[in-house]
Amino acid sequence: MKAELIAVGTEILTGQIVNTNAQFLSEKMAELGIDVYFQTAVGDNEERLLSVITTASQRSDLVILCGGLGPTKDDLTKQTLAKYLRRDLVYDEQACQKLDDFFAKRKPSSRTPNNERQAQVIEGSIPLPNKTGLAVGGFITVDGISYVVLPGPPSELKPIVNEELVPLLSKQYSTLYSKVLRFFGIGESQLVTVLSDFIENQTDPTIAPYAKTGEVTLRLSTKTENQALADKKLGQLEAQLLSRKTLEGQPLADVFYGYGEDNSLARETFELLVKYDKSITAAESLTAGLFQSTLASFPGASQVFNGGFVTYSMEEKAKMLGLPLEELKSHGVVSAYTAEGMAEQARLLTGADIGVSLTGVAGPDMLEEQPAGTVFIGLATQNKVESIKVLISGRSRLDVCYIATLHAFNMVRKTLLKLENLL
């Protein structure tokens, strides 16, 4: 099946907004086994939109239009598609009720006649309810071509796609089952090299590597009758892949850390902290609180994290953490001594089970004769204080800080997994 995405809106063409819907929809279609062959952006112009719809209908089986469902005159998507399909626009009862409920709480003058357009669907469509907005979406098949209309705002589009469109398409088309494997500590080029025979000879399941910032994912996919068969096929392939070794001889399973498109090292670490009822603190220099803010972004973070320190300068490291200033000057802030001292003092001062520290050179200039991207990460527990040195070269300041936090979370994760193996 060939799909085409059409983004409607002059603001996309003028660069006022970024078309993030295209990426989201492409991922969702891939999960369903639907191939997106074309992506188009067109302005709020009926003639040009008609031309784009005509072209899409000649080359695609599924046409998804995003944007242009609002109440204003330049919101033309449903009207133009209805004209192309030679169908009337009718009112969806549920969408009309939502308009009534919405404006019942507002001044009567706020409900202008053009608002009613948002409750219209093309005659013969399956309405796609909009839980977070007023403009109803729709799905219709005419002459073997399926058309979808969706609102433009991502906050409205995503719930409709996840809760309405994906289940609808799943019933109509064969389902693609996928499993995403996540790796940290290996680059995409090496991972592809190690698995080259699998990738070059793949049929079903398929293997698709993706490079992320600081990590790599593999999407394993198969088309089959049900989830149980898919789990069996994907599980067998996963076991074969993870049995391979890196070019350094390290088991690939050692750099694999979890599953899922929306998973992360931080989430895996947080869940282990909760599982083992361990508290954590941090003292951060170059990352300036990024580790702690990431940790605090998870609901329930207060179970494991009460607070920490941001000590950017040498003087603040001495003042807030109680580290000897002369020793800091002697060893330098970019050193194992400083990283270990920061982690241990943070742990002792807060009473946490685990203390983490990050200190180094975000760049672009050198510091203490250390190149940009040099980072020391400390970790302290009741039984041990240690540190690692990593070099994150050729990256921006933001990437250096982000990847440094990944290393820190991975260090904590491995420590907690050792605890798990002892139980």
Swiss-Prot record:
A Pfam family it matches: CinA
Taxonomy, superkingdom: Bacteria
CDD domains to which the protein is assigned, alphabetical: cinA
NCBIfam families: cinA_nterm, molyb_syn, PncC_domain, PRK00549.1
Family: Belongs to the CinA family.
HAMAP family per record: CinA_B
Protein name per Swiss-Prot or TrEMBL: Putative competence-damage inducible protein
Annotated organism of origin: Streptococcus pyogenes serotype M4 (strain MGAS10750)
Gene for this chain: cinA
